Amino acid sequence: MGTIALLRLDTMILDIARHKFYEGIITLLITTIVMIILLATSAGDSGIASAPDSPLMSLISSATFGSGFVEGLITVILYIVSTLTLSRSTLRTHIYTADTMAPIALCSVMLLPMITTGDALHQAVVVLLLAHAMANMFYCFSHRKCFHRLFAAMVAASTLAVVDASLTIVPVTMALALIAARKKLREAVAVVVGMLLPLFAYCYIAWLQDVSFSESLLLWWRSLVAPLSLNILDNLKLTRLIFIAFIVFLQATSVILHLSHREIHSSVMRGSWRTMQLMFVASLCCALLLPSASDSLLTVVVMIASAMLSMYFINSSAMLSVVSYVALASLAFAAAI
């Protein structure tokens, strides 16, 4: 399994390198170094409120790997793989061109303040699952035969709801968007089965441990509706609050920019953007209104926004792109400290 994982990572790096994304790789490496330093210096510092005991939350949070160094290393590896996965899919589906450097560079810096918040390993798992869900979702709009992509996207998205019940809105909105886009019964069945499979697997594993299916579902439902002791906004540092508010503002303006040039965009980009807009708005509303909203919801909001902010770099000049990116990166680093 380790060899397969390394080969997959090498394939992603080489695929991005063929598109002349060296700047993005360098950015990712620099951001990773900063992330390692932040994880080492802020161990145990919970930036915002912790999430409730959802099905797999306690397992991930209590996981021990012998030392904090190993846990930090695993977190960094998940962070790198997630960024490369999302960036590679935007290139191969032609959502963004190879000249835009933005997908890999933006994802790496925009996620930095969220990964280094609270339980870093849990946040890295959420980012990894969402990256695979979004990557497979992009392929669903670019290929006629995408049965396996539909299934893989929904399995990854639905696993988010098992990891953290407050993220249930992600698979629900993605499923509705994919069913509406594909409009075929066979593919709708694949979406529904993929969405239910992770929850069934969790209930089955709990059943093997003498916990009934109904009790497992009841635990998941309580995790979804049970309020946190602290609202995520009440315990949010000012720098991260400013960062998230600014990202939400930029995402809203990027939608206007996308709609103003909609006729020149491909059908793949239009379909992907509609789905990301739906997921972004739904996740943001849940983060503000859902009693059980955890910090993972804010991570989802920032990650979806980072994939959409690349719109700013498509037609902008090189100088403006550099200045804008440096400003965004500076804000992200300041929010992560």
What is each PLM-predicted segment?
Residues 77-93:
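Transmembrane-helix motifs of polytopic, lipid-linked glycan transferases
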Residues 105-124:
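Aromatic- and kink-enriched transmembrane "portal" helix at the membrane-lumen/periplasm boundary
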Residues 133-148:
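Membrane-interface transmembrane helices that cradle and orient dolichyl/undecaprenyl
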